[in-house]
């Protein structure tokens, strides 16, 4: 790994015997990691957010690899497959439909439920259309031998990007896995755009910061577009509501729904700019 990114990320410390974990008598496994004191990346600070994008692109660039496995007689060659978001979002669509049926059958509705029921149909129609388009693109994308993967952080958001005197320090790699880089880029970009009311200028600047280090290929750009297009925020609101007690609905739910609807025009504007 490049020395710059090696210094900027937590590391597992090995035991004297070279093991990266130890297990106690109860079978509980422990690890020891490096750690630096610091504060979370300030999402209101444009320069810090740009630097976080540079760091992510550098991390992806240094951790890219092409899977190769030695051929062994009688043993099938392992295959590393990309995560296909359309499959997960198809599941989300079923959950949204289930919640919509529940709301339609519910006779006594709160103001939040009335408001939610009124907006679900257009969002659900959009979600279904996005999934269909996405599947066609995924199916037409040839996954050839020698395709490049990278090790993703898995949870690259400002909580895990610590600022200290020496610069940024990345922590909590527990969800690290081999996948496409858009897994990380989408998560951070969506969080920052939501916090800035989907400001187009800021979104373009953040994406340009990433691409100044590691340009996206055409498929990655499409992947990012469709991930950002899916109404995941609505699904989160609906999922939390449907799986919790309905006798009392937190005011926070209403606030999140109102904010989502207020940002929808700006979100659509940014997506028109991003569309490949």
Which residues are covered by each model-predicted region?
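ATP-binding pocket architecture of kinase catalytic cores
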Residues: 1-77
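Active-site acidic catalytic loop and adjacent metal/ATP-binding pocket
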Residues: 12, 132-181
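A glycine-centered beta->alpha junction motif in the catalytic cores
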Residues: 28-43, 65, 97-106, 188, ...
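ATP-dependent phospho-/nucleotidyl transfer catalytic cores
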Residues: 39-41, 70-151
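Hydrophobic packing residues in well-ordered alpha-helices of helical domains and bundles
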Residues: 49-52, 116, 120-123, 203
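Active-site activation/catalytic loop segments of kinase-like enzymes and analogous catalytic loops
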Residues: 182-215, 228-248
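ATP/Mg2+ or Mg2+-diphosphate-binding catalytic cores
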Residues: 235-276
């Amino acid at each position: 790994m490049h020395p710059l990114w090696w210094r900027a990320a937590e590391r597992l410390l090995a035991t004297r015997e070279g093991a990266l974990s130890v297990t106690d008598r109860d079978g509980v496994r422990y690890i020891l990691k490096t750690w630096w004191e610091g504060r979370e990346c300030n999402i209101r600070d444009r320069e810090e957010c740009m630097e976080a994008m540079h760091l992510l692109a550098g991390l992806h660039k240094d951790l890219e690899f092409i899977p190769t496995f030695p051929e062994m007689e009688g043993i099938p060659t392992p295959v590393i497959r990309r995560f296909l978001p359309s499959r997960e979002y198809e599941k989300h669509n079923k959950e949204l439909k289930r919640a919509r049926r529940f709301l339609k059958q519910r006779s006594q509705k709160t103001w939040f439920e009335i408001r939610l029921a009124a907006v679900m149909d257009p969002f659900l129609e959009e979600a279904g259309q996005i999934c269909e388009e996405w599947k066609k693109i995924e199916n037409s994308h040839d996954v050839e031998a020698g395709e490049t993967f990278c090790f993703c952080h898995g949870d690259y958001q400002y909580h895990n990007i610590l600022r200290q005197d020496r610069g940024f320090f990345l922590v909590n790699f527990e969800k690290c896995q081999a996948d496409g880089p858009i897994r990380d880029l989408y998560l951070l970009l969506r969080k920052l755009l939501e916090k800035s009311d989907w400001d187009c200028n800021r979104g373009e600047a953040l994406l340009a910061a990433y691409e100044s280090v590691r340009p996206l290929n055409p498929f990655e750009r499409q992947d990012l577009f469709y991930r950002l297009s899916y109404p995941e925020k609505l699904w989160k609101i609906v999922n939390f509501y449907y799986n919790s007690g309905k006798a009392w609905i937190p005011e926070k739910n209403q606030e999140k729904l109102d904010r989502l609807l207020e940002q929808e025009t700006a979100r659509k504007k940014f997506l028109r700019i991003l569309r490949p």
